[in-house]
């Protein structure tokens, strides 16, 4: 049988020795940077890569980072379930968006200072009072106390159920992913970008190595000036062909495609 270790460094460190599979795979889908992992993961993960027959990751950056420990380290992409994202559906406007002026620049996801650039958002929103900035998701303490809350054109709508977030996205005029660039996000695969694109939405995002995969389908930005320029461009009405291409591109990131790549690297 095959053994697949899904980023489980501690509990699975001796799994190869105990289970004796004919082929072992270590799946690396995140930089393990939290306090729980920080003490031992930098020492153990390279050794786990070395003892595995194959290492796969969901982004080029995460694969490249461990190639010195295992030459058989490859990016297999990220599978995303987009079955509920359908532009033919008529999604009802959420009640807490009814009185928000348009155009709306929106984000869906955890609103955390570990991943999002609050100061960038503040600069952009401050300089663009004609736009509404909507954040859908639970906030950490940093964001709860941030001056963003003092801006009348910034709206924090709180955490929603996953199935509800589609309605919010569908009523954004532009979708955004204003990430910080740090050890967590530099190789992180942004599944929400695929969700945005699956609805045909124009997307602006912070430029990272992984976001290069989306070149030609999103606006990749660095700094407030580029973000503001991208928002202005993204709000210009576009053709149905471009919308269709966004949707089609998002649907290339399927679990089927990811697993097919995985199988192509398994050599038994």
Where are these regions (language model features)?
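Nucleotide-activated donor-binding/catalytic signature segment of Leloir-type glycosyltransferases, i.e.
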Residues: 143-169
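A charged, aromatic-enriched C-terminal amphipathic alpha-helix characteristic of glycosyltransferases
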Residues: 239-267
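A short, active-site helix/loop in glycosyltransferases that binds the activated sugar's phosphate group
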Residues: 52-75, 213
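Conserved acidic donor-binding segment of nucleotide-sugar-dependent glycosyltransferases
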Residues: 217-225, 233-239
């Amino acid at each position: 049988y095959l053994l697949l270790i899904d980023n489980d460094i501690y509990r699975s460190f001796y799994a190869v020795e105990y289970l004796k599979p004919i082929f072992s795979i270590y799946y690396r889908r995140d930089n393990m940077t939290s306090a729980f992992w920080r003490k031992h993961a930098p020492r153990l993960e390279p050794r786990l890569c070395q003892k595995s027959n194959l290492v796969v990751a969901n982004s080029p950056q995460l694969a490249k980072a461990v190639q010195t420990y295992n030459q058989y380290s490859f990016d297999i992409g990220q599978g995303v379930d987009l079955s509920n994202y359908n532009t033919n559906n008529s999604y009802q406007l959420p009640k807490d968006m009814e009185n928000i002026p348009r155009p709306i620049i929106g984000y869906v996801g955890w609103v955390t200072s570990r991943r999002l650039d609050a100061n960038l958002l503040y600069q952009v929103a401050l300089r663009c009072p004609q736009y509404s900035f909507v954040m859908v998701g639970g906030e950490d303490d940093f964001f709860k106390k941030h001056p963003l809350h003092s801006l009348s054109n910034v709206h924090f709508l709180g955490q929603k159920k996953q199935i509800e977030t589609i309605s919010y996205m569908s009523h954004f005029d532009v979708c955004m992913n204003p990430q910080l660039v740090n050890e967590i996000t530099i190789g992180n695969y942004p599944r929400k970008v695929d969700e945005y694109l699956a609805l045909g939405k124009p997307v602006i995002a912070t430029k990272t190595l992984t976001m290069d995969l989306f070149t030609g389908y999103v606006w990749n930005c660095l700094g407030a000036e580029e973000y503001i320029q991208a928002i202005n461009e993204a709000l210009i009405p576009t053709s149905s062909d471009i919308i269709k291409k966004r949707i089609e591109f998002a649907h290339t990131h399927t679990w089927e495609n990811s697993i097919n790549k995985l199988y192509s690297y398994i050599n038994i």
